[in-house]
Amino acid sequence: MKRFRIVAPLALMSLALAACETTGPGSGNAPIIAHTPAGIEGSWVDPNGIASSFNGGIFETRTTDTNEKLAEGNYLYLSPQLVEINMRSIVRGTTSKVNCALVSPTQLNCTSSAGSRFSLTRRNAG
């Protein structure tokens, strides 16, 4: 009887550990969820097909057909959802400030210091 008291809890513990092992990731039971980057890091596109990238504080805008750089600058977070971009237009030779609000994980609404408004949509990775 004493032996049963030792073996039974060990057997139950083994079953519990085995259950954890077989229901973890990779067992086929967990759904795969696409990960959207946090904040504005990554690639975005405007309705005209102009691509903008935000990477480690560096901002760039390029054409999608020839990859010509149109603007460059830097950005900083004013809050988790609000970003200030200081940019220089290579095409126009001007500098401006743009404030952008992350209204959803895939949409960025922006207003330039001149008052023009535009939206950017996050590009799919891959």
Swiss-Prot record:
UniProt KW keywords: Cell outer membrane, Lipoprotein, Membrane, Palmitate, Signal
The compartments listed are: Cell outer membrane
Which protein is depicted? Outer membrane lipoprotein omp10
Output the lineage of the source organism.
Bacteria, Pseudomonadati, Pseudomonadota, Alphaproteobacteria, Hyphomicrobiales
The entry's family comment says: Belongs to the rhizobiaceae omp10 lipoprotein family.
Q: What else is known?
A: Elicits an immune response in B.melitensis-infected sheep but not in B.abortus-infected cattle.
Report whether Lipoprotein shows up as a keyword of the record: yes
Q: What are the lipidation residues for S-diacylglycerol cysteine?
A: C20
Give the signal peptide, or none: 1-19
Q: Which positions are lipidated as N-palmitoyl cysteine?
A: C20
Query: Which top-rank group of organisms is this from?
Result: Bacteria
Q: How does it sit in the membrane?
A: Lipid-anchor
